[in-house]
Structure formats: structure tokens, C-alpha cells
């Protein structure tokens, strides 16, 4: 029985009031009647539709979102579509067509997002046992106002700890994580009244007990911010951005008190049209975000109700990671550093009763980069600042990654020779490659995905170039190295259908040596195999496994830290142990390695091996320690006390500081003049600047100019000594001042810092030659490398004695009669160990053995003294001793053999909190009594007390003393390696490339700091880079690169040509650009314009922060009432057209076509009289009237906005005028003025010369005399 109009309205009213949910499709006529009912019902009518803001507690403070967006008068009757009415029936109010929310497209740039924690490091990015090393203070990869990857409204948020089990989560933490298993936009826009319903629902249905089994690994419980909350709020502030292309807000859901998360997800899918599939979501069946929480498995468990996480049952006996620092003995010890007694409590020592093989463990579930496998978007990774400044920062980041930002490396050119043949394409390749390096330097705690790398492109036609640069940077170890975790989203190829369970084969890579080179090699190989896992699965084999064979019971090699003892020992006990003990005393306090699992629990530690880091020689390690691992590295600041043995006095501290500045300038200048690839203009500029510096520092210099022609003919060290002689004679330096410079030369050579500072633009930082020390010891670096994100498979006490390579296998024989059969071998031990103790079959090539023989290792002897209290002056960084041998060497006298055996003694009190002095023994200046350890300690102690004791403090009680020697054993050759063939400048031009820091000999690979050790970085960083470089040959042999030739296809080539024409890059002339920058006037104008642009940008940002964004003009309404009638009556007319066609054809299943429906619409419209058309005409008139009101309001708001913005701009401009001009701009201004004066002077001189020349050419013959009276004939 058909229902009348009033019956349909009653039904609609019933469904609206009860908020019932429909699973079946409603009849179109019912939808139409609901629309009319919604139109004729007042907004504030309690029996009408449910408005979303009315469900909040303060429903009088906010107007209807629909009314604000579509109507000025809230009491005006509303015409809505059938879809809007259906959404109202399903439980939500009338939603705005253009919602006030963030853009939910996965890779649409959202520069207005206020969620500052989107790209910051999540809690779970570090192991839960390494809590105090969570670098939450680090800046995110993108600024707080720029977040390129906006995924729903909770992308890349850390997984809440309280959902995994019982925890003491606070109220803020509990309320911030109620969206697990719910649509993101629904969870982030809950009204307060309904939010409590969901909180009760989740309290009653704990996800930790139902959805997630107990075997899921726990996350870190450390707070993500200083507020103490265990989670980050989804929105840190109000969202002001309105995007018309954003995915619309979904309606408010039904009451969830009796619904499970799967039912909520099903309801969520029913409410969303299947025709719209944002790229944020995984597939057509699931509308859950790809990274709803940190772990990918969690989103799969919510989506599919299955948790495919393998059980994490721990093995019975597992060798612990190198997480414990051994306690230093309270007794003064001597003897060899590698003595067995000394290694009993070393770092990473294996506990008693454990087996030597460490089984592999399940990979920890670290948070991965959000949405790295979705569709890329051009410009998504570029910040909102100007491209010019961004490319400058990108070029600087490339230098920090050991890349020339404007040239291809030799191995890069070999790899890409067939693909980068066009200079214009090469120009864009450099910009893209440098920008990817900027992403890595900005935040190395997250691995860079291919999609994120493609986001640095300004146009999508450059995506192939980004893939090319990304492939090169990943394979050669310039990015994505260290303690990183990779999931399936980082695989470089598409999945071929092969899974790890169906694969049957697996290769093995063995790394011999667990020093820094071996550990970073194993960790990098593990990461590369994870990123290229699909390449192995496509061949029906598992990614290769990596094992490490270590000869000793600890890891770290020459990185060796020991915890300082707490107890104090008397002086009598010290003398007794010093004279009678050659090992650690049994009476000293010991620390069980099992009890210490976190280096942060160690109060203080001292390094017996590598200790100091210097910039820029160790920039890569410093970036890894500071930004990725969160290891605190402090600079050793303070003054230096220097004692001259010849003059028997302590030099003036002001004079020492002045000479230290001179030494730094000498090192910078020689670095510029030494490299043959430095442009002549840059060299001339540095010569003039250095000459000006010397003239200002030493006014009594000679009148002649400083000549440095010898720097082009000798090695770096020889050039430095020649420069010291010339500067000393030119500046009239005294004998003590020259000895100080030579002493600086000797100290730099001993500290392994005497290398040319190889930078392209000679941009020397102010903190060069300032030593940096890792608090709690440098052994935290190898401890982290072998422990995170999953422990490496290390086999201890495996002394390899023979390596046999036959056919496709490599056999490793150990001294304990054990044998390993692997596919490839990496030798990462010391050169003397594998050249003397390891037999190779077949033998090593001649060029390898010759290179090893050319390396000279310094012994690395070190003395450490611990006192009861500091007896020296405060704020003293080091104590220097200028020996008599320097004076004898300067005067060409014979050495009497009584010179001091130390050059510098470091004060470690500010870094360790314990009065400790560390001295490196100079192997070239040893006294006659230095062979005996006890005499060495007593002599050094007496020297310090006699020359550097403060008069106000007479107490100098020595508690402990340790002496280490890294050359008196068969495993280590010494501490630092030095080349014997370092006189060739061409060797320094290699810029310590990764590919030239290892040998790839088929299945045998050799890595270490002794390979091409003449490059410009210290031994420690060379060891690190060598371990990275050896992985390139391995991954290339196992997973070859797959790139198309040419790299840019025909279609992309056309798009690129059009893009280049639009951007006018074809007219780029590097020579003209270089000539333009040579002028100081042009450089000053650019610098000034850059400052003005920066002020303008800050000005606009200030206006935006204070006033928000400029109001958007209202959309113009439709002026044709028939179109409104057609939209609202489509379903009715289609039903009428269907009935007419069935009546004409006699077919009960006949359907009318679109044209027939349109004809029916036109016919019914024409049949309406004026009264029937009046509602539609009135609605159009009302919309026009509302539009007129909106226009007036928009004009008023715009005028007010512009007036206030102009006032803010004027105030900010007045403030900027009062600020002083930056020093670099003022310097350029002075140089530009001087250049202009010189130009004018030159111009005047040329004019004067031309006048003089014209006067000489002019001769007066009297013909122009006015008194001449000619006779006319």
C-alpha cells in the first residue's frame, strides 16, 4: 500500500530520531521525502536532523558547520541532497561540502598542518632497553610548519604503550590514543559527549588482550616530549587550512557500546563510496590508512583480524650484546692492552657458561617511514622556503655526505655513464641527489624511502632521475646506514608472489673481525638485504644472512671503553700494585656484564683506544652519534697551559690563544693552496685574506709580500713546515712563538688531524680542531651497531687461520678446528693479522700486499692518571709541553735523548666528572726510563705536579694509573695508520671516496682504514667508511642494479623539455654565472636581496601566525532553478520514466535511459505552474541573497585583514631597519665600495691617460692664431 507524504515524513522523522543504521539501499522516493523533510525543518528543531556541533557540550559556542559553509541565516530552510539526508539518518549531521580539515591525500603537501610530531622520531625507533638515548630533542626532517606526507590525521604516530598491556598511562596519554581500529577522521573529531562512550568501550574491550597477543614485542615507555605524555596529540593546534580537494569528513558514527572494532570498520566502509579511493589507503577493500599506527603489522591486524607476527620465543642461551662496560681496576696497572687478564671484564665480554655462537633473534618491530610505498608526489619533500636557499642547504648536505655537489664521482660516472649524457639532465640530477642528501642529514633516524626521495623533484617527469640518484646513494652507503629498521615498504621492486616461507635457498656472508669496520659492514649488509629482499625472493631464495667471526671475547676492536671505579684507593696501595702487578688486581671492584645492559647506567667511563673526534675529519661519525644514536658528544673547551722546557716557563695564555688562531688559519690556508683543483680566483682571494690576517695580527711585519710558491711543489706536511718558516720570518715571530707552531704541528700529527681540509667552497667551520668526546665512552657506538634494531650474529673466539676459495664457496678454518662454509667473505681485521696469521688459497694479489706494506702504524701508547682531587687551575682543557728537542731540531743540534716523552696532556674532568688526565706517548720522544711502566707513570706524575700545580692547592694524590699499548700483540698493529707514500697530491684529491676504501676480489673482500689511508680523514672515520664501501660490491653481485636505458623515456623526455622551457633552464650559462659572482658589487646585491627576501618571508609568516590566512571568497551559487530541480528530483523522475517505459514495452524489468530520464525531468518542470516552481525559485533567490551577504562579509573581512596585515608589516619593517646589518653583508658592502672606488680610479686614470695622449698628438702650427693676417692674392 503506497504511503502518503505525511507517512513518509513520519518514517523519516522516526529514523532520524532513533539514528538507526541501514544496511539495505533506501528507495529513491524515501530519500526524496527525507530531503524535503530536512528542508522544511528548522536547524534548531530537536525533532529535525542532528547537527554535529549540537552534540558537543558547548553547543551554543559553535554554529552549524553546514550553516557556516552554505548559509548565512541559520533559520533559513535548507535544501539538501539525498546523500546528505542519508548521512544524517545514519547518525551524522549535515556535513560541509568543503570541510575544515587537513588534506587527507597521502602525498598532498599540507604546509599548514600544526602536527609537529609527524616526522619526528617516534618512541619505538629505539630499543626499549636504550631509553635514555632517545634523541627526542632532535629536529624533525621537516620544519614544524611543513609536513609533506599527510596521512589521515594520525600518520606515523607512535604506538601507545598502554595498548600492549597494563601500564600507568596518564589521562592525556589515554585520551590521545582512542582511535585504534577506528576511522582516523572520526577518531580525531569526536565530540566530547560521544568520546567518553568510546573510552568506556575500549576499557571494556582491551586491544591488548583481544587483538594483540602477548608475544608482540613491547615498545619504549619513555615520553616522546617533555610533557610526560606517552603519546603525541593528533592535533597540536587548530587546523586552519581549508582545502576544497580534501577528502570529506565522514559522518559521526553510531554508538559503539555494543560494537566491535571489526563492526565499526565494516560500518566505516559502508558509509564511504567505493568510487573514491584516496591514495592514502591500501586497497579497494580496506579504507584503513596504511600506517594507522607505527607498526605495519598492527594495521593489518585491525584490518584483517589476523596478526601475522612470528613468536618471539627467546633461545635458551643467547650471547648478550656488547652492552656492558667493564669496570676499571682500582689498582694502577701496566702491561699489554691485549693481555688475557685485562680482557676478562672488557666491553661486550661473553658471560661464563654461554656458547660462542649467538643465535639470530626476531627483528624488533620498529616504526617505519610512513606511507613509503604509496604514489609519489612532485615537490612533496621540498620545504616551503625558497628553492634557492633549499638548494644551498642541499649542496652543503652533499658535502657532509662526502660528495661533490657539482660533479660526479668517478664510480658514479661509471655507473651512470649511459644515462646522464645531457648537461641539462645532469644539472637536475645534481639538484635531486643533493636534496636527497639533505633529507638524510636533516633526520638520519628514519630511512629514506624511494617515494620520499622522489618527492624532492619539482616535476614528476624527474622521478626517474630521483630513482637513479636514490639507487646510487643507497648502494654506495651515502644514506640509509646505521641502526635503522626496514619493512616491506622499502623494497625496490614489485612483489613477484614469492614469500619467505616458500623460498628454499639462502646465501651466507661472513665478516672476519668485529671492530668498527666489521660491525658497520655487517649492519649495512643486513639493511641492504632488507631493502632488496624482493630481488632475492624473485629468485626463490631468502635474503642472505650475515655472521661475524671475532677472535676475542669482545667487540669494538680499537674502540675500547672501561667504566671508572667508584672506590678510592690509598697511595700506598697504588705504589704496591704499580711495582708488583701487571694485570688487574683481584681486590678491585668488578662489575658483572650481565648486570649492565645499558651504557647510560654507567656514571663515567674512559676510552683506552680511540677517544677524540674532530670536525670536519669525523663529520660522518659525529652526525651518526648525535642525530641517529643520540649519544651525547661534548666539546673540550677551555684554555691550554703550555710549558717550554727550553725557557723553563709557562707561556702566557693570551699569547697561546693568539697562536692557536694562527695555527688554524695556517691549516685552512694550506688546505686551500695544497689542492690542485682549487680555482685560481679562489686561491688568489684566500692569499689576499691570509695576507690581511697576518698584517692585522702582527703589525711589525716585513714590508715585502708573503711568498708561498713552495706549497705547489711538496707534500702537505712539507708545505706546512715551509709555510711556518715563511710566516715566522715575515711576521717576525720570536723563537718561542715559532716553537709553538712546530709543537702544534707535532701534536696534530700525533692526534691524527694533520690532513688538508678538503672542501669545495673552502667553507671552514669555527669548531675545527676542537676535540669532541663521547660521554660514557665511545664504545657505545659498536654496542649500538651490534644491538639495534636486532642483534647481529656474532661468533666469539673464532680465530680464522685459513681462507680457501673454491668454485662457488668459501671455506673458513679456525684454530679451534671449527669450519664455516659461506658464499662471500669480508676481511675486516688488522693487516698484520690477516697477512701473517691467515693463509689464503689462492694468495692475495701483489697490489694488495704492497699497499699493506706501505702503511705505518703508530704504537698508540697511552697513560691515564686518576687523582683524588684536581690540583690544577680551573677551565684548563689541556697541558702542553714543548720539549727541548724542538729547539735542537730548529738549531740543527743533536738530540741529547733527555727530551720529554709527551707533548700534550688532556684534562678529562669536565667530561667524566672525575679528575683524570690522559696523555698520548710520543713514539719519537721517549726518555731512557720510559721502557719501564712504573718509571713512566712516576715521571709523568712528577712532570705534571712540577709545572702545572696550582699554588692554592698543594694536594696531588694519585689514585690510579693505566698504561695501554696497542702494538704489543699479534692482533692489533697500532692505533692510528699513516701512509708512507703520502707525498703525492693526487692521492689527496680522492676526497675519501667510499668505493676506494676497500678491495673487492670476487668472493673475497678486504676492508680497513689501512686501504688508501692517505685520504683526508682520520683513522676512525676511514674504518667506518671502509666498512660501508665494501658492501657496494657485495650487493651489486647479489642484487644487480636494474635501471632502464635511457633513464628518461620519450614521453618523459617531452615533459622534461617542456618543463625546462618553462623554467628557462636552457639559458643557464655556468660561465656567465661564475663571472657575475666574481664582482663584489653583484655579490653584495645578492646578499642584500637575500636578506630582504628573508625579511619579507618572515613578515608574511608573522602575518599568518597573528591573523591566519586571507579569507577565501564565497563560491557563486547556481542561478538556474531548473538545475536545482534536476538535482533534487532525479530519482523521482527516473522512477517515473521507468514506469512509463514498462507500460510502453510491457517489460516489468525495463529501465529508462539517461536521455529518457532527462526528458522526463524537462517535461515535469514545464508542467509545473508558478506555484509549483515557487520553492525552487525562492531557494535560488535565497541563495543569491545569502551570496550577497557573504560577499559583503567577505569584503569587510578582507579589508580588515589587509589593514591589520599592513600595520603588522610596517611594524616589522621598522623593527628590521633598527637591526644591524650582518657582518658578511657589511664586509661585502665595504669590498663593493672599495671595488667601486678602484673602478672609478681606473676610469679616471684611463681618461687622464687619453687626454695626455691627445695633448701629445696635437701640434700648434700657428694656423689658428687670431692675430694672423693672411694676404690674399
Swiss-Prot record:
Compositionally biased tracts (Polar residues): 199-230, 1264-1273
Location relative to the cell: Nucleus
Pfam families: Amino_oxidase (PF01593), SWIRM (PF04433)
Protein name, as recorded: Lysine-specific histone demethylase 2
DNA-binding region: 1115-1195
Family, per entry: Belongs to the flavin monoamine oxidase family.
Ranges of biased composition (kind: Low complexity): 574-590
Predominant location: nucleus
Stated role: Catalytic component of the SWM histone demethylase complex that specifically demethylates H3K9me2, a specific tag for epigenetic transcriptional activation, thereby acting as a corepressor. Acts by oxidizing the substrate by FAD to generate the corresponding imine that is subsequently hydrolyzed. Has a role in regulating heterochromatin propagation and euchromatic transcription. Also has a gene activating role.
GO molecular function: DNA binding; histone H3K9me/H3K9me2 demethylase activity; oxidoreductase activity; promoter-specific chromatin binding
Region (Demethylase activity): 542-1198
SUPFAM superfamilies given in the database record: FAD/NAD(P)-binding domain (SSF51905), HMG-box (SSF47095), Homeodomain-like (SSF46689)
The protein's assembly and partners: Component of the SWM histone demethylase complex composed of at least lsd1, lsd2, phf1 and phf2. Interacts directly with lsd1.
GO biological process: chromatin remodeling; facultative heterochromatin formation; heterochromatin boundary formation; mating-type locus imprinting; pericentric heterochromatin formation; positive regulation of DNA-templated transcription; silent mating-type cassette heterochromatin formation; subtelomeric heterochromatin formation
Enzyme class, broadest EC rank: oxidoreductase
Binding, FAD: 509-551, 558, 572-573, 1147, 1156-1157
Start-end of Basic and acidic residues biased regions: 1233-1253
Every SWIRM domain range: 394-490
EC number: 1.-.-.-
Known cofactor(s): FAD
InterPro entries documented for this protein: Amino_oxidase (IPR002937), FAD/NAD-bd_sf (IPR036188), Flavin_monoamine_oxidase (IPR050281), HMG_box_dom (IPR009071), HMG_box_dom_sf (IPR036910), Homeodomain-like_sf (IPR009057), SWIRM (IPR007526), WH-like_DNA-bd_sf (IPR036388)
Keywords: Chromatin regulator, Coiled coil, DNA-binding, FAD, Flavoprotein, Nucleus, Oxidoreductase, Repressor, Transcription, Transcription regulation
Disordered: annotated span: 199-237, 571-596, 1215-1273
Highest taxon of source: Eukaryota
Amino acid at each position: 500500500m503506497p504511503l502518503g507524504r505525511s507517512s513518509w515524513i513520519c518514517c523519516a522523522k522516526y529514523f532520524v530520531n532513533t539514528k538507526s543504521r541501514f544496511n539495505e539501499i533506501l528507495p529513491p522516493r524515501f530519500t526524496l521525502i527525507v530531503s524535503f523533510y530536512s528542508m522544511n525543518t528548522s536547524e534548531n528543531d530537536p525533532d529535525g536532523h542532528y547537527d554535529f556541533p549540537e552534540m558537543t557540550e558547548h553547543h551554543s559556542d559553535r554554529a552549524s558547520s553546514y550553516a557556516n559553509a552554505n548559509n548565512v541565516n541559520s533559520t533559513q530552510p535548507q535544501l539538501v541532497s539525498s546523500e546528505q539526508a542519508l548521512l544524517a539518518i545514519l547518525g551524522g549531521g549535515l556535513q560541509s561540502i568543503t570541510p575544515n580539515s587537513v588534506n587527507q591525500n597521502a602525498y598532498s603537501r599540507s604546509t599548514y598542518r600544526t602536527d609537529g610530531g609527524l616526522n619526528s622520531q617516534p618512541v619505538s625507533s629505539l630499543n626499549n632497553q636504550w631509553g635514555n638515548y632517545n634523541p627526542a630533542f632532535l629536529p624533525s626532517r621537516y620544519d614544524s610548519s611543513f609536513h609533506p606526507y599527510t596521512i589521515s590525521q594520525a600518520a606515523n604516530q607512535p604506538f601507545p604503550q598502554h595498548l600492549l598491556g597494563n601500564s600507568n598511562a596518564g589521562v592525556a596519554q589515554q585520551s590521545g590514543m582512542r582511535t585504534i581500529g577506528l576511522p582516523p577522521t572520526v577518531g580525531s573529531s569526536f565530540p566530547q559527549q560521544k568520546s567518553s562512550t568510546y573510552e568506556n568501550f575500549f576499557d571494556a574491550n582491551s586491544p591488548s588482550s583481544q587483538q594483540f597477543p602477548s608475544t608482540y614485542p613491547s615498545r619504549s615507555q619513555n615520553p616522546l616530549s617533555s610533557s610526560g605524555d606517552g603519546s603525541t596529540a593528533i592535533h597540536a593546534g587548530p587546523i586552519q587550512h581549508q582545502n576544497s580537494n580534501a577528502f570529506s569528513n565522514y559522518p559521526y558514527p553510531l554508538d559503539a557500546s555494543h560494537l566491535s572494532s571489526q563492526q565499526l570498520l565494516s560500518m566505516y566502509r559502508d558509509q564511504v563510496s567505493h568510487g573514491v579511493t584516496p591514495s592514502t589507503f591500501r586497497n579497494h577493500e580496506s579504507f584503513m590508512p596504511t600506517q594507522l599506527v607505527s607498526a605495519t603489522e598492527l594495521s593489518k591486524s585491525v584490518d584483517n583480524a589476523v596478526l601475522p607476527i612470528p613468536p618471539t620465543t627467546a633461545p635458551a642461551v643467547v650471547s648478550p650484546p656488547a652492552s656492558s662496560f667493564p669496570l676499571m681496576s682500582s689498582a694502577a696497572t701496566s702491561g699489554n692492552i691485549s693481555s688475557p687478564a685485562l680482557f676478562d671484564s672488557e666491553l661486550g665480554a661473553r658471560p661464563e657458561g654461554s656458547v660462542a655462537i649467538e643465535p639470530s633473534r626476531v627483528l624488533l618491530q620498529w616504526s617505519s617511514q610512513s606511507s613509503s610505498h604509496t604514489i609519489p608526489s612532485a615537490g612533496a619533500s621540498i620545504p616551503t622556503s625558497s628553492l634557492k636557499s633549499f638548494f644551498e642547504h642541499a649542496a652543503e648536505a652533499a658535502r657532509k655526505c662526502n660528495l661533490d655537489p657539482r660533479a660526479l664521482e668517478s664510480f658514479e660516472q661509471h655507473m651512470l655513464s649511459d644515462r646522464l649524457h645531457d648537461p641539462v639532465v645532469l644539472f637536475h640530477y645534481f639538484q635531486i641527489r643533493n636534496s636527497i642528501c639533505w633529507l638524510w642529514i636533516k633526520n638520519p633516524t628514519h630511512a629514506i624511502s624511494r617515494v620520499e626521495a622522489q618527492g624532492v623533484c619539482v616535476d614528476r617527469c624527474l622521478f626517474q632521475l630521483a630513482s637513479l640518484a636514490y639507487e646510487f646513494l643507497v648502494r654506495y652507503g651515502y644514506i640509509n646506514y646505521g641502526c635503522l629498521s626496514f619493512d616491506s615498504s622499502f623494497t625496490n621492486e614489485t612483489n613477484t608472489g614469492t614469500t619467505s616461507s616458500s623460498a628454499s635457498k639462502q646465501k651466507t656472508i661472513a665478516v672476519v673481525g668485529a671492530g668498527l669496520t666489521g660491525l658497520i659492514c655487517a649492519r649495512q649488509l643486513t639493511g641492504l638485504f632488507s631493502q632488496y629482499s624482493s630481488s632475492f625472493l624473485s629468485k626463490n631464495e631468502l635474503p642472505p644472512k650475515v655472521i661475524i667471526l671475532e677472535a676475542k671475547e669482545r667487540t669494538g676492536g680499537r674502540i675500547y671503553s672501561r667504566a671508572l671505579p667508584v672506590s678510592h684507593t690509598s697511595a700506598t696501595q697504588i705504589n704496591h700494585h704499580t711495582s708488583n702487578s701487571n694485570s688487574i688486581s683481584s681486590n678491585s671492584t668488578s662489575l658483572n656484564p650481565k648486570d649492565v645492559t645499558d651504557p647510560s647506567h654507567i656514571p663515567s667511563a674512559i676510552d683506552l683506544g680511540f677517544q677524540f673526534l674532530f670536525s670536519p675529519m669525523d663529520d660522518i661519525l659525529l652526525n651518526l652519534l648525535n642525530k641517529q644514536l643520540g649519544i651525547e658528544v661534548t666539546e673540550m673547551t677551555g684554555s691550554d697551559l703550555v710549558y717550554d722546557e727550553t725557557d723553563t716557563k709557562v707561556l702566557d695564555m693570551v699569547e697561546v690563544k693568539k697562536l692557536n688562531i694562527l695555527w688554524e688559519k695556517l691549516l685552512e690556508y694550506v688546505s686551500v693552496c695544497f689542492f690542485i683543483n682549487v680555482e685560481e680566483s679562489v686561491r688568489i682571494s684566500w692569499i689576499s685574506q691570509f695576507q690581511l690576517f697576518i698584517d692585522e695580527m702582527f703589525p711589525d711585519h716585513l714590508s715585502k709580500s708573503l711568498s708561498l710558491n713552495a706549497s705547489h711543489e711538496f707534500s702537505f706536511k712539507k708545505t706546512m713546515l715551509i709555510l711556518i718558516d715563511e710566516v715566522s720570518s715575515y711576521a717576525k715571530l720570536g723563537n718561542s712563538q715559532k716553537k709553538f707552531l712546530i709543537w702544534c704541528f707535532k701534536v696534530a700529527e700525533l692526534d691524527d688531524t694533520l690532513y688538508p681540509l678538503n672542501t669545495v667552497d673552502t667553507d671552514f667551520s669555527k669548531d675545527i680542531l676542537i676535540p669532541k668526546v663521547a660521554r660514557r665512552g665511545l664504545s657505545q657506538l659498536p654496542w649500538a651497531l651490534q644491538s639495534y634494531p636486532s642483534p647481529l650474529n656474532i661468533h666469539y673466539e673464532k680465530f680464522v687461520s685459513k681462507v680457501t676459495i673454491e668454485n662457488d664457496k668459501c671455506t673458513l678454518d679456525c684454530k679451534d678446528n671449527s669450519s664455516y662454509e659461506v658464499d662471500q667473505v669480508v676481511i675486516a681485521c688488522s693487516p698484520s693479522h690477516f697477512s701473517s696469521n691467515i693463509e689464503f688459497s689462492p694468495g692475495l694479489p701483489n697490489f694488495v700486499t704492497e699497499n699493506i706494506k706501505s702503511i705505518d702504524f703508530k704504537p698508540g701508547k697511552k697513560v691515564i692518571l686518576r687523582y683524588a682531587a684536581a690540583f690544577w687551575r680551573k677551565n684548563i682543557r689541556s697541558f702542553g709541553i714543548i720539549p727541548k728537542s724542538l729547539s735542537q731540531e730548529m738549531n740543527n743540534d743533536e738530540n741529547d735523548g733527555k727530551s720529554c716523552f709527551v707533548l700534550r696532556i688532556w684534562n678529562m674532568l669536565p667530561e667524566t666528572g672525575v679528575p683524570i688526565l690522559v696523555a698520548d706517548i710520543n713514539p719519537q720522544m721517549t726518555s731512557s726510563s720510559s721502557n719501564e711502566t712504573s718509571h713512566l707513570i712516576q715521571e709523568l706524575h712528577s712532570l705534571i705536579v712540577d709545572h702545572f700545580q696550582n699554588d692554592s692547592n698543594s694536594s696531588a694524590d694519585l689514585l690510579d694509573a693505566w698504561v695501554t699499548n696497542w702494538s704489543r700483540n699479534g692482533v692489533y698493529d697500532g692505533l692510528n695508520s699513516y701512509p708512507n707514500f703520502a707525498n703525492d697530491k693526487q692521492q689527496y684529491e680522492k676526497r675519501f671516496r667510499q668505493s676506494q676504501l676497500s678491495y673487492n676480489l670476487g668472493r673475497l673482500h678486504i676492508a680497513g682504514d689501512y686501504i688508501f689511508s692517505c685520504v683526508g680523514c682520520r683513522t676512525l672515520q676511514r674504518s667506518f667508511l671502509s666498512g660501508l664501501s665494501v658492501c657496494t660490491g657485495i650487493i651489486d653481485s647479489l642484487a644487480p642494479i636494474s635501471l632502464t636505458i635511457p633513464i628518461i623515456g620519450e614521453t618523459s623526455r617531452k615533459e622534461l623539455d617542456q618543463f625546462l622551457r618553462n623554467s628557462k633552464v636552457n639559458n643557464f650559462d655556468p660561465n656567465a654565472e661564475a663571472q657575475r659572482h666574481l664582482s663584489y658589487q653583484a655579490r653584495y646585491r645578492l646578499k642584500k636581496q637575500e636578506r630582504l627576501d628573508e625579511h619579507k618571508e618572515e613578515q608574511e609568516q608573522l602575518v599568518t601566525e597573528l591573523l591566519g590566512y586571507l579569507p577565501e571568497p564565497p563560491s557563486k551559487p547556481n542561478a538556474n532553478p531548473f538545475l536545482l530541480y534536476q538535482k533534487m528530483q532525479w530519482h523521482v523522475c527516473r522512477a517515473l520514466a521507468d514506469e512509463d517505459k514498462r507500460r510502453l514495452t510491457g517489460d516489468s524489468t525495463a529501465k529508462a535511459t539517461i536521455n529518457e530520464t532527462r526528458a522526463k525531468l524537462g517535461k515535469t518542470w514545464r508542467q509545473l505552474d508558478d506555484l509549483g516552481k515557487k520553492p525552487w525559485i525562492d531557494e535560488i533567490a535565497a541563495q543569491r541573497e545569502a551570496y550577497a551577504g557573504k560577499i559583503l562579509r567577505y569584503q569587510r573581512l578582507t579589508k580588515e585583514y589587509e589593514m591589520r596585515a599592513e600595520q603588522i608589516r610596517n611594524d616589522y619593517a621598522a623593527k628590521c631597519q633598527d637591526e644591524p646589518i650582518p657582518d658578511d653583508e657589511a664586509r661585502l658592502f665595504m669590498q663593493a665600495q672599495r671595488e667601486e672606488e678602484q673602478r672609478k680610479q681606473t676610469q679616471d686614470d684611463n681618461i687622464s691617460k687619453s687626454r695626455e695622449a691627445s695633448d701629445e698628438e696635437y701640434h700648434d702650427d700657428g694656423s689658428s692664431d687670431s692675430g694672423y693676417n693672411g694676404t690674399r692674392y
